[in-house]
């Protein structure tokens, strides 16, 4: 079954980096609006080191697992230092003309000598009746460390074993591989053929078990885009440009392509076609954001790729009037916009696209930043989650679309109390200064102590005590 819309509803974290516990709800889910008629924007604000980037990291981990890929080798470093496990639970809305329900995917990372592995996974489903969520029903649960039966409930275990003659052996092998590779068991390539045989429909929702698996996996591959701070860091190095791509109907399209800024790039012919289409799409918007600017592709002819496929050698140029310059010499802000514009266009036009961007404001002029967010909020269709330090968006978008980090690791994310009047920016600064919210928003720093610390640091540098 193909769903008309899939959207992220909420994210809840336990012991992820410096977040002991925190929950974020998308604006639509918070007011039980699942229509998908308009965009949802969620901005995350707070002081440095308060847990903003942790949300983006958790979404990246979820995307890796749902698409069957391994977690990064340093995954163990994302588990809080005082804990052995970190947990992330994401809720999604799956809707069609006939029905709509919420599916929760929860995964647990366990610290290990080689980093971390996925110790537990759980899929559950909740029906939506008159805007209210029914109690959660467990669809399947995996426990990597269980002895004997490691899938629950027992009815699902029996169903899976009955689907193939050698299912028990194949499941045991898949479990070992997933632990070693730090990948998902439920969404791995090894278990997909086994679970595809479990087509018994859920009695309450009338939905086949297999359909939910394939829907979440396809959504993570084609609809969920995560842009980390490493993305901006790569641009700042001026050696390459990470170009985030979205291409409808092609689950083989790479999420991100690294284009060299110091020499022409070589890409396979099929990927190059996508680059050409993307550049045409980018030019429709780029000339409005940066007047009189467009991109142009200069081809240098066919060239075989390192893996032996037919490819094209090309370079992307920045064009302003009659002047053409290599993209390397454009400003960091322009390169940042170019690198993520394709997926922002997709988010604007597709209700089932969710874009998560860390440090969205990096290198972008604050007035332009506010205008982009306002347009995406007012007339877009998809979802955007972003972190930022620039306070201009607080004046431009609806207050319900902003959450703030707190100094309490047990309750890391909150929305501001609406009392007190004034725009959100003024209320936020006032709350930092005099309090008045449910949680403290800022760990106080004394300006005199900061000045004294700078003086002491200078003496240390001079070798004086």
What feature does the model see in each segment?
Residues 1-68, 73, 310-453, 460:
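Switch/communication elements of ASCE P-loop NTPase nucleotide-binding domains
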Residues 10, 99-128, 152-155, 303-319, ...:
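Short, well-ordered strand-loop elements centered on a beta-strand within folded domains, enriched
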Residues 19-20, 94-103, 125-138, 305, ...:
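Short, surface-exposed beta-strand/loop "edge" segments at domain boundaries and coil↔beta transitions
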Residues 42-43, 56-114:
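Conserved P-loop NTP-binding catalytic core
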Residues 59, 63-66, 109-111, 278-294, ...:
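Hydrophobic, Leu/Ile/Phe/Ala-enriched alpha-helical segments that form helix-helix packing faces
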Residues 100-111, 131, 137-140, 293-299:
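Broad, structure-driven detector of short, well-ordered beta-strand segments within folded domains
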Residues 112-288:
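Electropositive, glycine-dotted interaction segments
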Residues 254-329, 436, 445-448, 452-465:
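Extended helical coiled-coil dimerization/tether regions that scaffold
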């Amino acid at each position: 079954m193909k769903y008309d819309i899939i959207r992220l509803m909420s994210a809840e974290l336990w012991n992820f980096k410096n977040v002991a516990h925190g929950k974020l709800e998308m604006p639509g889910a918070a007011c039980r609006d699942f229509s998908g008629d308009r965009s949802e924007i969620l901005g995350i604000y707070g002081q440095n080191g308060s847990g903003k980037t942790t949300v983006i990291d958790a979404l990246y981990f979820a995307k890796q697992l749902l698409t069957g890929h391994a977690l990064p080798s340093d995954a163990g470093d994302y588990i809080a230092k005082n804990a052995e496990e970190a947990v992330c639970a994401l809720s999604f809305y799956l809707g069609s003309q006939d029905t709509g329900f919420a599916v929760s995917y929860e995964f647990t990372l366990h610290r290990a000598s080689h980093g971390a592995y996925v110790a537990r996974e759980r899929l559950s489903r909740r029906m939506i009746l008159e805007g209210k969520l029914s109690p959660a029903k467990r669809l399947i649960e995996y426990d990597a460390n269980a002895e004997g039966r490691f899938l629950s409930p027992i009815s699902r275990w029996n169903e899976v074993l009955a689907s193939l003659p050698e299912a028990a052996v194949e499941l045991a092998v898949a479990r070992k591989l997933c632990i070693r590779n730090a990948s998902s068991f439920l969404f791995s390539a090894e278990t997909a053929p086994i679970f595809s045989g479990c087509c018994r429909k859920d009695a309450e929702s009338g939905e086949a078990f297999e359909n939910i698996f394939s829907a979440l996996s396809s959504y993570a591959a084609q609809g969920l885009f995560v842009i980390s701070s490493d993305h901006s860091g790569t641009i700042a190095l001026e050696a390459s440009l990470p170009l985030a791509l979205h291409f409808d109907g092609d689950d083989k399209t790479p999420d991100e392509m690294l284009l060299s800024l110091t020499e022409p790039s070589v890409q396979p012919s099929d990927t190059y076609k996508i680059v050409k289409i993307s550049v045409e799409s980018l030019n429709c918007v780029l000339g409005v954001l940066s007047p009189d600017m467009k991109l142009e592709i200069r081809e240098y002819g066919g060239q075989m790729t390192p893996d032996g496929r037919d490819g094209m050698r090309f370079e992307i140029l920045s064009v302003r009037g009659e002047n053409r310059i290599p993209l390397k010499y454009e400003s960091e802000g322009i390169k940042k916009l170019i690198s993520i514009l394709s997926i922002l266009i997709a988010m604007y036009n597709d209700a089932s696209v969710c874009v998560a961007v860390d440090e969205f404001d990096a290198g972008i002029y604050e007035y332009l930043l506010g205008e982009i967010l306002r347009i995406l909020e007012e007339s877009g269709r998809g979802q955007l989650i972003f972190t930022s330090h620039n306070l201009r968006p607080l004046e431009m978008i609806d207050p319900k679309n902003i959450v703030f980090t707190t100094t309490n690791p047990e309750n890391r994310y909150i929305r501001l109390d609406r009392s007190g009047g004034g725009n959100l920016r003024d209320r936020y600064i006032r709350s930092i200064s005099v309090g008045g919210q449910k949680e403290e928003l800022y760990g106080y720093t004394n300006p005199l102590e900061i000045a004294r610390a700078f003086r002491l640091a200078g003496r240390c540098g001079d070798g004086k005590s």
